[in-house]
Design a protein with these regions (language model features):
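Membrane-embedded alpha-helical bundles of multi-pass enzymes
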Residues: 1-216, 411, 422-425, 437-448, ...
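Short, conserved active-site loops that position catalytic residues or coordinate cofactors/metal ions
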Residues: 26-41, 65-72, 231-233, 261-274, ...
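Short glycine/proline- and acidic residue-enriched helix-loop micro-motifs
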Residues: 89-96, 234-240, 351
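Membrane-interface segments at or immediately adjacent to transmembrane helices
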Residues: 153-159, 202-267, 277-288
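Solvent-exposed soluble domains appended to multi-pass membrane proteins
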Residues: 244-250, 265-505
Length: 505
């Protein structure tokens, strides 16, 4: 097994396979031990490499992770973006190759400045700190792509109880630390005191996670609310076709008129496929219907505003009936809602000129939505995958709501991964999450991240259920990731500036 730690393609191919295997730790497969194993394989493989060799090994790991975990983007490019199969594959490989640098650069940094082979305990701690910072960095750089975090593997695993303490990143940190410690236990046998410390660091988080799993950090703020989420299952090919707009509006109107009386009526992202000011008459009619039923209707709708004599378009969500508020999406999907380097790319191929791909970013510090006397934190599609952003809204809310249109990804696993991240947000916040989508998966999620009810994908249907407004804050909503970030910076600073001290550990 020495070839694992040595340079060369055998080790690089193993790193590629380890990255790819992470997919199986996440939804819909949920074989969570593979997340631990894949990190351990990468960690072991960096032990004897030069910085340049470590960089390429990390790149192989990242390419495997994104290649296996986000292949479903091909559906958007080919089926809906107009790219030929060959062009879609080329673009996708370039995308994977670029994202792989999120792992290549940290592994270079690790081998160049931070690795302490002679100090296994310090080595494991610093590796976990660097792992956390790379996850945070890829959720921030160039607006971020916070997909495939290792911590999501634990939604139903032993570490789930840590999510309300420190979010998905605390779980990722624990997985990386555990993987590195397991790889180093045999090297600590000659030093019983340090072996004991390693044992505590290894076991304590897992025992704590299991002990806190199911612990209620929040409590009800009122009586249960009845919910109806409308899943229209509108085909993406006709979504923005002017010839089909009236039919879509009639579909949601009729499904709502025939639905059971509830407190909250939820329509998915851009259920109203015309600008809000153009559809205001229709929205008012639906609002009066909702008010007569003592309901609030919440729907996705694009919004047009004039700012400094310039028109701006937003992906929005609005409330009518017994509620109020309009929210404008802040976290936009690259190429789907805006085109990076648009002067160069816009119009080059159909994929860079998708309908409604010129949205502006909504302002920060927007008020939450109000419905039935409660504050609702809104997340439009992609926004729910950002842990810190989601927490900033959840801390002011009684309920969480995410609306989405995952039709772009066909029958792939992309929507299942998306749902898993929404479940983690509910667990982190200790709040109920309503998830309404165009074609699935529409679901209600309880404060422990469990799906209480859902309806099948690819069907026109109405989901009925109850949610409970919640009050009080989980530790994660109070402190976010600041304590963990400070710990990681201190650990890495110690490794950089006090290498001699690390050698004695």
């Amino acid at each position: 097994m020495r070839w694992i730690t040595r340079p060369g393609w055998p080790g690089n191919l193993l790193a590629l396979a380890a990255g790819a295997s992470t997919l199986l730790a996440l939804a819909p497969f949920d074989i969570w031990p593979l997340a631990l194993l894949s990190i351990a394989v990468l960690y072991l493989g960096l032990r004897e490499l030069t910085p340049r060799q470590a960089m390429w090994r990390g790149w192989c790991f990242g390419f495997g992770l994104y290649g296996a975990g986000t292949w479903w983007i091909y559906v958007s490019m080919n089926t809906y973006g107009g790219a030929s199969p060959l062009l879609a594959i080329v673009l996708l490989l370039a995308f994977f190759a670029a994202l792989a640098w999120f792992f290549a650069l940290p592994t270079w940094l690790w081998a160049r400045w931070l690795r302490r082979n002679e100090a296994p305990l310090a080595d494991a701690l610093c590796f976990a700190a660097l792992w956390l910072l790379q996850e945070a960095f890829r959720g921030w750089f160039l607006t971020g792509f916070p997909w495939l975090y290792a911590g999501y593997s634990q939604l139903d695993g032993p570490l789930a109880g840590l999510a309300p303490l420190g979010g998905v990143w605390l779980i990722s940190f624990t997985l990386a630390l555990s993987a590195a410690l397991l790889c180093n236990l045999h090297r600590l046998r000659a030093r019983p005191s340090f072996l004991a410390v390693a044992g505590v660091l290894l076991l304590a988080p897992w025992l704590l996670g299991m002990a806190l799993k199911g612990h209620a950090w929040t409590k009800p703020a009122g009586d249960p609310l009845k919910v109806a989420a409308i899943q229209g299952n509108v085909e993406q090919e006709v979504k923005w076709d002017p010839a089909h707009i009236d039919a879509q509006l009639a579909l949601y109107r009729d499904m709502t008129f025939t639905s059971k009386p509830v407190d909250l009526l939820i329509w998915p992202e851009t259920a109203v496929p015309v600008l809000k000011d153009q559809a205001q008459g229709y929205i008012d009619v639906m609002g009066r219907f909702a008010a007569e039923r003592h309901s609030a209707l919440i729907t996705g709708v694009p919004v047009r505003e004039v700012v400094h004599h310039q028109r701006r378009y937003y992906n929005g969500i609005t409330v009518t009936g017994e509620g109020d508020g309009t929210y404008l999406k802040q976290k936009l999907v690259p190429f789907g809602e805006y085109v990076p380097l648009q002067d160069m790319l816009r119009g080059a191929i159909e994929f860079f000129n998708l309908p409604m791909s010129d949205f502006a970013r909504g302002p920060e510090d927007q008020p939450l939505l109000q419905a039935k006397g409660y504050q609702i934190a809104p997340y439009i599609c992609y926004e729910v995958v950002y842990p810190e952003f989601a927490a900033s809204l959840a801390a002011r809310s009684d309920l969480l709501l995410t609306i989405s249109n995952d039709t772009w990804f066909g029958t792939s696993i992309g929507p299942l991964q998306h749902l898993q991240m929404a479940q983690m947000r509910a667990l982190e916040a200790g709040r109920w999450m309503i998830r309404a989508t165009n074609n699935g998966i529409t679901a209600l999620i309880d404060p422990f991240g469990r799906i209480t009810t859902q309806i099948p994908q690819f069907q026109q249907a109405v989901l009925y259920g109850e949610v409970v407004p919640m009050q009080q804050l989980t530790p994660y909503l109070q402190w976010r990731s600041w304590p963990l970030a400070i710990l990681c910076v201190l650990l890495l600073g110690w490794a950089l500036l006090a290498g001699r001290i690390a050698k004695t550990v």
